A protein has these predicted regions:
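Carbohydrate-active catalytic/glycan-binding domains of CAZyme proteins
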Residues: 18-180
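Bacterial Sec-dependent N-terminal signal peptides
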Residues: 1-23
Length: 180
């Protein structure tokens, strides 16, 4: 009988936890948004937040106060990343996004935690609006890679700037050997 009561209590607790967790379609106040390495982009009247997460987490908001989850950039880990970065499981880090030459360019980190087995990837989309018929992320693969016992730097945490001549530049780095 004790096992039945314990099992019932455990099931009830799990159900309550599931019911109280935010659903992907629910609106979440900004004070409840928990994320790592966020970057914002605005298209039209909508802000889009990209962050570290499985497939690159994406959220949207009209007012920066109320957010909703969108589908991740990648439903599955990019094959090039799985093949290139041993230990990478689709948890993609520190995205950065710019709008340049009519496309949104998203740069992201694929890494094995605690190692400099890493690479920075690049994807583009003509729009950030998931309801647009033009919405489609195109992955362009690896931009740069770091390899243990070869490189004394780590290819993670990309940041893109565009200079006064319209030329994009990337910097990246970590505690391995600073910014490159």
């Amino acid at each position: 009988m004790k096992h039945i009561i314990f099992s019932f209590c455990l099931l009830a607790a799990a159900s309550a936890a599931y019911a109280s967790s935010p659903k992907k379609s629910s609106v979440i106040p900004a004070s409840k948004v928990m994320t790592h390495d966020p970057v914002l982009a605005k298209q039209g009247d909508t802000y889009y937040l990209f962050a570290t997460g499985q497939g690159i987490s994406v959220m949207s908001s009209k007012d920066l106060k109320n957010w909703k989850f969108e589908k991740p950039v990648f439903e599955e880990a990019p094959q090039w990343a799985v093949e290139t970065v041993k230990g990478y499981n689709g948890h993609t880090w520190a995205p950065d996004i710019i709008f340049h030459n009519g496309l949104y360019h998203l740069f992201y980190s694929c890494s094995a935690f605690g190692k400099n087995t890493s690479a920075i990837g690049h994807a583009t989309n003509p729009t950030l609006d998931p309801s647009s018929p033009d919405f489609k992320w195109t992955d362009h693969g690896k931009v740069i890679q770091s390899v243990p016992n070869r490189d004394m730097w780590n290819a993670i945490d990309p940041n893109i700037i565009i200079d006064e001549n319209g030329t994009p530049w990337m910097n990246f780095g970590s505690f391995w050997d600073g910014i490159k």
